Amino acid sequence: MQKKNLDVFNDSHIKVPFVLPEITNEDKKAIMSTLNQNLLTDGPKLRIFEKEFAKFTGAKYAIGVSNATAALHLSLKAIGIKKGDEVIVPDLTFVASANAILVSGATPVIVDISKEDYNISISSIENSINKKT
C-alpha cells in the first residue's frame, strides 16, 4: 500500500494520509459476480454481509445501505427525527449531512468549526441549542 501526506489546508498542522486502494483479483471476481446478477444495492450478497456484520459487531441485526446519505437518513429516522425538528451540523462537512436532515423533514442548523482542530465548535453547538434541536 502506497501512502502520501497531503496538506489539505495550506497553513495547517493537520496532515491527511492518502492511501491508494488495494484491489485484488479475488475482489474483482466478487464485484463482477454481483454485477452479473444485476443486483447493485440488494440481493443475496447483501444479506450475507448484513448477517456477518451483525455477528462481527455483536448486534442482533445489521442493515446494509447503498450510500452514506441513506445511512444518515435511516439513523435520523431511527432516533425519531421528524418534520419541525432541528439538527445541528458543522459548516465544514459533506453535503450528505445536511441532505439527510432535509430528507428526514428536519431543518439543518449549520454551526462553525474550531480553527484548532476543524471539528464542530462546542460553543457554536451550545449557542444553537433550543427546544427543536
Regions found by a protein language model. Give the residues of each.
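Conserved PLP-binding active-site segment in aminotransferase class I/II-type PLP enzymes
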Residues: M1-A78, K82, V103-S104, S121
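PLP-dependent aminotransferase-like
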Residues: K77-T133
